[in-house]
């Protein structure tokens, strides 16, 4: 009997264990049922009844499931967490890295209560975190929900928990975290990459075991709490990219400093100086204080004691004084970036000691003087040297040739002289050599071409002599070659055609002769451009007018404040605008042909090669001030991306090819001072450009010059000359005949004048009566849509002319505007917005214009209004609604615009009911509208002087002309209103709900990246057919949040407008279109593309895939 009882109990135990294992297997199979895709066969073994042998499953000694790890399995479908609730022994759950495995955040409360560790990072988790979900799991210590699409707030979630590690980085969570209470057990807290606001929680000082604190990329404000310095074991402190103020707490250099390895406070508004107490941080490897307002000198003691530091990032501050010699003590220092400060004095002679680890030395945009120390060659690992915009003088030390690892040597705008050292040819890894704007002379050493990996060579504005060496043809990776403004002579070597990666060629202002090589436009594109120019920050400084030669220049702009350009003497004399900055142009890696070609200010002769028309992405072509002959090739009309075309001051003949009408991106053309003839093509943009750009061609006619019909034909002129040369009749007969004619003419003229005077007087009386009636109705307000403010003095001004920018409206008066709108009646009202009401006016000749009546403001005066009008009136582009004129009378301000017959995109897309209007816009039409609106906004950002931030980009400000071409409207309005009214809050000028970027709610500081966000919302409207705000559709969120949530859930197709046919190539285009739109509406401005990049992406949307070699 004693033996039977244990056997019976054992049998019962085995039976219950087996039953429990079967329950675990059933739970896992229920979970598997919701997984629709398993491309890697992760769950293929989940078939036999024993779950402990299944992949990703770990069991205890009793055969119960304790761990489920399906990380990076490529699973797709839905993670049904409720199915796992029966796994009551499950301690660890890892579903990370399954981006298409969607998890409802609300299900986080349905997991087994025994859970210790939870990792759902990099997955499809979306929604709000349930209140108190951590309290459901008393043993839970480690939670990682990073890089998902979580929303909602954090406060209260960490209460009553034993959490040791909590990571919700890279989500869309928000709310004020100032008052959140944190558990004393906390060791790792990562809230980075969200939208949290408020101050850094003071409760952090109670987390004595905290080792990692990452609050970067949020909207936190206030000072860094002094109490953080009391956390003895803190290893990582990252509060970068917030709005923090105050100084770096000196307390960080006390208790916390003993273990601190990473200190990041960059991209805030931190002030004060670098505390000397940081000299105690012997373990510090990364010190990042960049992009703040830190001032004072670099404490010598700090650099002398940070022997473990590897990265010293102090750029973009106001740090002054000289660079301490003690930097040589930082034996482990790999990256030293002190860009954009006020560091002065000479570089320490012992900056580099033998065996130093230094790889990057960046000191651009400072006040460093003296010579370059030859001892830099001791830093044998140096890859990057950047000393741009300083006061260095003397020659480049030939000892730099010993730096065999050197990849970038950038020293533009200094006072360097001497020659380019031939020893640099030993730097076989050299990719970038930028020495422009110095006093370097001599020829280009042939040894330099041993550096066959060169990608960017810029020697512009020096005193280089000799010829352009044919050895440049060896450089198959050469993408940028700038040799402008030197004394180079001879011919352009045809071997440049072998530079199969060449994108940017600027040889302007030299003494070059001969013809333009035909191979230049024909031999490009045979080498893939992968990796070329990667890591470079580019800026194109474009010259305006003729104060400086050439179109402009491409600069390496990393670590340089844009305003510093204004202080560069050689640039200060130029009228310039910074046209483009950012990463390498995306089109380069796709098409592999020249984008920029400037050969102006030379002595080139011969004809313009037809082959230049094969450069499909060419944006700038400047051949001005040469001795070119022949005709402008019609093939250049194939350059659909061409923005600048200048062939002025040559000897060209013939006409302007009609193919130029297709150049929709053209914003500047100058063909003046040639021998061209014929009519200027009236299609496209050529007729809208200034007449001065066609001057000096006596044979040219048509808008914007005199109409061709106004010129007498040659035969007529010959006939008049012949008549003038015939013999006169006898004198007496002529006198008798003339007397009779004169008498008749005088009598007729007198009668005609009397009749005309009577008619004019009668017409004036009728007009006066009509004007008085109109004025009365305007002031009564009974027939009008608005309230008018006209004093008695303005009654006499109803005949005032409208100041116009178009010839056909030269004689338009205010009275005619009243008549054309029936007294600005409600029937003529076609729209209203934040800046005023818009009326349709039908003029006497049947043409229509749109009239915007600005809101009444406390105007500062007429000068500001007229100055803004003159600026806006000169802005002309195919994709902008042109301002035709303006009228000022009393307190009224009227703007006259070209009328857009198809109304706004908002009306066309949404109609009156909030859904797509009928007939629905096709996908091709939507793409066309997106491209046009992008070009218009891009023009405002980069081509207008001064640049214009729209501030209210939305679908109602995208108008459609008769050809359904998009025109951006209301540009410049926010700036005009703010210039006229001193009492208008900036917040009222910052956009329309649904289009306003999140950063505007924090600072109200409008930027071009804010416009990009608003444009991204317009793209989402085109894609979804939905308005940006609709409580029925989106509840408490908006279109942007709704689309992000759907895409995060893997349901991106559900957001597409039902009116669109999604199939074939269109489906792929829509996916790319959505990806581009989501880039535009990224919460972080720095992650959004600029409009130049958006235009390029839209252009590539329709581009055929690049041809492959056979």
Swiss-Prot record:
UniProt GO cellular component terms: plasma membrane
Listed SUPFAM superfamilies: L domain-like (SSF52058), Protein kinase-like (PK-like) (SSF56112), RNI-like (SSF52047)
Transmembrane residue ranges: 741-761
LRR repeats: 87-110, 112-136, 137-161, 163-183, 184-207, 209-231, 232-255, 257-281, 283-305, 306-330, 332-354, 356-379, 381-403, 405-427, 428-451, 453-474, 475-499, 501-523, 591-615, 616-639, 641-662, 663-688
Domain Protein kinase stretches: 824-1101
Keywords assigned: ATP-binding, Brassinosteroid signaling pathway, Cell membrane, Glycoprotein, Kinase, Leucine-rich repeat, Membrane, Nucleotide-binding, Receptor, Repeat, Serine/threonine-protein kinase, Signal, Transferase, Transmembrane, Transmembrane helix
Position of sequence motif Cys pair 1: 52-59
InterPro entries according to UniProt: BRI1_island_dom, Kinase-like_dom_sf, Leu-rich_rpt, Leu-rich_rpt_typical-subtyp, LRR_dom_sf, LRR_N_plant-typ, Plant_RL_S/T_kinase, Prot_kinase_dom
Glycan attachment positions: 94, 139, 149, 172, 214, 269, 293, 305, 378, 450, 485, 498, 627, 662, 675
Binding-site residues, brassinolide: 580
Leading EC class: transferase
Motif Cys pair 2 positions after renumbering to this chain: 701-708
Bilayer topology annotation: Single-pass type I membrane protein
Superkingdom per UniProt: Eukaryota
Reaction(s) catalysed (UniProt annotation): L-seryl-[protein] + ATP = O-phospho-L-seryl-[protein] + ADP + H(+); L-threonyl-[protein] + ATP = O-phospho-L-threonyl-[protein] + ADP + H(+)
Principal place of residence: membrane
Catalytic residue list: 952
Protein family: Belongs to the protein kinase superfamily. Ser/Thr protein kinase family.
Domain notes: Contains two pairs of conservatively spaced Cys (Cys pair 1 and 2) possibly involved in forming some heterodimers.
Protein name listed in UniProt: Brassinosteroid LRR receptor kinase BRL2
Species annotation: Oryza sativa subsp. japonica (Rice)
């Amino acid at each position: 009997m004693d033996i039977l009882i244990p056997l019976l109990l054992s049998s019962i135990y085995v039976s219950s264990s087996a039953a429990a294992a079967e329950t675990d297997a059933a739970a896992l199979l229920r979970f598997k049922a919701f997984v629709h895709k398993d491309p890697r066969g992760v769950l293929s073994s989940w078939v036999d009844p024993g779950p402990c042998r299944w992949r990703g499953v770990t069991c205890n000694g009793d055969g119960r499931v304790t761990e489920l790890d399906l990380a990076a399995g490529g699973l797709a479908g839905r993670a049904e967490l409720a199915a796992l609730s029966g796994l009551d022994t499950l301690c660890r759950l890892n579903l990370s890295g399954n981006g298409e495995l969607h998890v409802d955040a609300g299900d986080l409360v349905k997991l087994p209560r025994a859970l210790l560790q939870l990792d759902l990072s990099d997955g499809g988790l979306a929604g709000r975190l349930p209140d108190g979900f951590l309290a459901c799991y008393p043993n839970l210590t480690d939670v990682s929900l990073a890089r998902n699409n979580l929303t909602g707030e954090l406060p209260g979630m960490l209460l009553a928990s034993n959490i040791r590690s909590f990571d919700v980085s890279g989500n869309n969570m928000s709310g004020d975290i100032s008052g959140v209470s944190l558990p004393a057990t906390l060791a790792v807290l990562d809230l980075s990459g969200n939208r949290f606001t408020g101050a850094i929680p003071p409760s952090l000082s109670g987390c004595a075991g905290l080792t990692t604190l990452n609050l970067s990329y949020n909207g936190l404000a206030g000072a860094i709490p002094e109490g953080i310095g009391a956390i003895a074991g803190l290893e990582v402190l990252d509060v970068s990219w917030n709005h923090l103020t105050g100084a770096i707490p000196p307390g960080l250099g006390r208790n916390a400093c003993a273990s601190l390895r990473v200190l990041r406070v960059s991209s805030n508004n931190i002030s004060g100086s670098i505390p000397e107490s940081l000299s105690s941080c012997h373990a510090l490897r990364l010190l990042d204080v960049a992009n703040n307002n830190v001032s004072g000198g670099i404490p010598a003691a700090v650099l002398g004691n940070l022997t473990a530091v590897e990265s010293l990032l102090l750029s973009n501050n106001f740090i002054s004084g000289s660079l301490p010699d003690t930097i040589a003590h930082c034996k482990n220092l790999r990256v030293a970036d002190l860009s954009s400060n006020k560091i002065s004095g000479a570089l320490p002679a012992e900056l580099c000691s033998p065996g130093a680890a230094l790889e990057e030395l960046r000191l651009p945009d400072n006040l460093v003087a003296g010579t370059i120390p030859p001892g830099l060659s001791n830093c044998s690992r140096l890859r990057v040297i950047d000393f741009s915009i300083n006061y260095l003088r003397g020659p480049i030390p030939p000892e730099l040739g010993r730096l065999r690892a050197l990849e970038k040597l950038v020293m533009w705008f200094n006072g360097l002289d001497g020659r380019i050292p031939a020893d640099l040819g030993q730097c076989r890894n050299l990719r970038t050599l930028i020495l422009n704007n110095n006093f370097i002379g001599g020829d280009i050493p042939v040894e330099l071409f041993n550096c066959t990996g060169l990608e960017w060579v810029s020697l512009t504005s020096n005193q280089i002599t000799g010829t352009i060496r044919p050895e440049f043809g060896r450089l198959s990776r050469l993408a940028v070659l700038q040799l402008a403004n030197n004394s180079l002579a001879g011919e352009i070597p045809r071997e440049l055609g072998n530079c199969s990666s060449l994108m940017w060629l600027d040889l302007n202002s030299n003494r070059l002769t001969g013809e333009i090589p035909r191979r230049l436009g024909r031999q490009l594109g045979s080498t893939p451009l992968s990796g070329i120019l990667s890591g470079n920050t580019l800026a194109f400084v474009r010259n305006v007018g003729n104060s400086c030669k050439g179109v402009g220049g491409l600069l390496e702009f990393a670590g340089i404040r844009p305003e510093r350009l204004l202080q560069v003497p050689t640039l200060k004399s130029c009228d310039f605008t910074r046209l483009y900055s950012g990463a390498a142009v995306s089109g380069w890696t796709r098409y592999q042909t020249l984008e920029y070609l400037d050969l102006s200010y030379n002595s080139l002769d011969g004809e313009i090669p037809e082959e230049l028309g094969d450069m499909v992405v060419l944006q700038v072509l400047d051949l001005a001030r040469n001795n070119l002959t022949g005709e402008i090739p019609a093939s250049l009309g194939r350059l659909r991306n061409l923005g600048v075309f200048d062939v002025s001051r040559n000897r060209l003949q013939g006409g302007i090819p009609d193919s130029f009408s297709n150049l929709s991106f053209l914003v500047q053309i100058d063909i003046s001072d040639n021998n061209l003839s014929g009519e200027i093509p009236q299609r496209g943009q050529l007729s809208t450009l200034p007449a001065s750009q066609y001057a000096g061609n006596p044979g040219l006619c048509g808008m914007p010059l005199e109409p061709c019909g106004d010129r007498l034909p040659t035969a007529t002129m010959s006939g008049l000359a012949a008549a003038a040369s015939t013999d006169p009749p006898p004198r007496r007969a002529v006198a008798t005949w003339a007397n009779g004619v004169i008498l008749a003419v005088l009598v007729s003229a007198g009668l005609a004048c009397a009749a005309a005077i009577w008619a004019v007087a009668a017409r004036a009386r009728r007009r006066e009566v009509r004007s008085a009636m109109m004025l009365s109705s305007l002031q009564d307000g009974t027939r009008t849509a608005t309230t008018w403010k006209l004093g008695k003095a303005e009654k006499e001004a109803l005949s005032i002319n409208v100041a116009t920018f178009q010839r056909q409206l030269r004689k338009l008066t205010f009275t005619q505007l009243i008549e054309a709108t029936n007294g600005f009646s409600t029937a003529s009202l076609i729209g209203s917005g934040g800046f005023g009401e818009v009326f349709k006016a039908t003029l006497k000749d049947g043409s229509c214009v749109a009239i915007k009546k600005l809101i009444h403001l406390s105007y500062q005066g007429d000068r500001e209004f007229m100055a803004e009008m003159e600026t806006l009136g000169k802005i002309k582009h195919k994709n902008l609604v042109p301002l035709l004129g303006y009228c000022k009378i009393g307190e009224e301000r009227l703007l006259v615009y070209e009328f857009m017959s198809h109304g706004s995109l908002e009306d066309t897309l949404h109609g009156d009911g909030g859904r797509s209007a009928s007939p629905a816009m096709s996908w091709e039409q939507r793409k066309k509208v997106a491209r046009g609106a992008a070009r218009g906004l891009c023009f405002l950002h980069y081509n207008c002087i001064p640049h214009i931030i729209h501030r209210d980009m939305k679908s109602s400000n995208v108008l459609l002309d008769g050809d359904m071409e998009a025109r951006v409207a209301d540009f410049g309005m926010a700036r005009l209103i703010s210039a006229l009214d001193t009492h208008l809050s900036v917040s009222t000028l910052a956009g329309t709900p649904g289009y306003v970027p999140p950063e505007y709610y924090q600072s109200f500081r409008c930027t071009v990246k804010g416009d990009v966000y608003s444009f991204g919302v317009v793209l989402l409207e085109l894609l979804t057919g939905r308005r940006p705000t609709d409580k029925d559709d989106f509840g408490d969120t908006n279109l942007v949040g709704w689309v992000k949530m759907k895409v995060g859930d893997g349901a991106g197709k559900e957001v597409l407008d039902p009116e669109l046919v999604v199939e074939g190539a269109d489906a792929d285009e829509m996916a790319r279109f959505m990806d581009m739109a989501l880039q535009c509406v990224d919460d972080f401005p720095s992650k959004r593309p600029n409009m130049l990049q958006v235009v390029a992406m839209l252009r590539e949307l329709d581009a055929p895939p690049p041809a492959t070699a056979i």
